Amino acid sequence: MVLDRYARFADSADVLSCPLCHSALKLQEGSLVCPKRHCFDIAKQGYVNLLGPSRQSAHYSKESFESRMAILEAGYYDHVKEAVLTAVGRALSPSEGPAAVNATPFRVLDAGCGEGFYARAIRENLCVDVVAFDLSKDAMLMAARHDSRKAVKWLVGDLTNIPVLKGSINCVVDVFAPSNYDEFKRVLTPTRNASAPGVLVKVVPGSNHLTELRHLAEGSLRSKEYSNQLVTDCFEKHFKMTDRIKVTRTFEMSERDVRVFAEMTPLLFGIDAESLILSRVKSITIEAELLVGTPRSQGPS
């Protein structure tokens, strides 16, 4: 009998690849092993380190992920989560129906998943298989511990060498994280609806995201205003935009939660939060844009 923490990796040979030789990884007792005998143990918490020695940024410490988790679980990003679920659901819907019953599971990859908030939501709300990775071991420890269903394949992995087989993913989700479009195109496969290509759902900050904190710290920032145009242009160079959705909400917020936001947001990395009069901030705007697209075989025509 396969232990619960191992069961989610039973079909690893269909999706996971060795980071050293890129061949398929197969579950053998409590480890993932490739044909060349490279072996990666499954941690008791339920994740696998497919990276080696972690080189995470000091900005993304265990404490920063705990702060992020507190904010996410408080509901401030629920409107973003719901939009992501809708976008992934639309990618999934063409494959539903009697013809898909015995087909390969619809697989979603959460790239740069952090503490796993979105990956867990996708797995809990949609009938899909979820693989999620992050460069941070601390993040994966937290993600795996909060995965009560023991259903997501959690990996410590590198965006420049995603430990996933070519063409094994139907939908890549990238929420407020860096992108590697060449790797995304490599892992994406046509969906189960004939020749329909795989889908990328990339979530980026909107122009009004955290505008209250931006105004408070404007004297210390390179730019008083934010635009995601460069990110959007790069997206469209590699993926054909099929949808673009903006979601925004402004929340009244306690001084404690404002301080947690200030500590966790990359906007204020390198700025001494103690130098800011955070008590002036009574509300914070959470605005995101979802860029949804399919891979371009070449540059835009």
Predicted feature residues:
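N-terminal auxiliary segments of SAM/dcSAM-dependent transferases
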Residues: 1-58
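A short acidic, Gly/Pro-enriched loop at the edge of an enzyme's catalytic core
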Residues: 160-171
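A short SAM/SAH-binding and catalytic strip from SAM-dependent methyltransferases
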Residues: 169-183, 204
